[in-house]
Amino acid sequence: MDYDSPDPMNGASSNALIAKMNSAKLLYQHYLDKVTPHAKQRWAVLGGLLCLFMVRITMAEGWYVICYGLGLFLLNQFLAFLTPKFDMSLQQDEENNELEAGEKSEEFRPFIRRLPEFKFWYNSIRATVISLVLSLFSIFDIPVFWPILLMYFVLLFFLTMRRQIQHMMKYRYIPLDIGKKKYSHPSN
């Protein structure tokens, strides 16, 4: 028996499996590309999934640790969404050096996010679906006193958001499009 040569039947089934997986990946990417321009609908679906998850947690009266973990993950993603990609304090140090040298420029610098909107939505959808799936198995229902988790989360939320708002005020940037002037193409 020759062990060096691959089994032709095994190779054919392996190639068929790889072809099916590649086809599924392409189909998945195709649908992701189709939903990309529809931001309002994407976020509405995420809101619906989060409501479904909260109803599931409330009705089942369990899986509070999974809910807490999802909340922390979404908070982390939201902070990355609000945070600029480049550290403002380093840029301010460079500007101070320019001021001393007399080279201050009022050049416009756009706000570039650390986490783009689509990736924020995509990561949030994946985390919510995973949390919904985990809430189907009783092994993940760890007994815990949920008011403590809620208090921890609320405290963490307020402390991190206060720090983020102070950072936004200190370096004078607005990460959201609310109140910003929108330019449109003139219609003929």
Curated annotation (Swiss-Prot):
GO terms for cellular component: endoplasmic reticulum; Golgi membrane. Keywords: Golgi apparatus, Membrane, Transmembrane, Transmembrane helix. This is Protein RER1. PANTHER family: PROTEIN RER1. Pfam families: Rer1. Its main location: Golgi. Belongs to the RER1 family. The chain crosses the membrane at residues 43-59, 62-82, 139-161. It is a multi-pass membrane protein. Involved in the retrieval of endoplasmic reticulum membrane proteins from the early Golgi compartment. Required for correct localization of SEC12, SEC71 and SEC63 in the endoplasmic reticulum. One of its GO terms (biological process) is protein retention in ER lumen. The gene is RER1. It comes from Saccharomyces pastorianus (Lager yeast). It is found in: Golgi apparatus membrane.
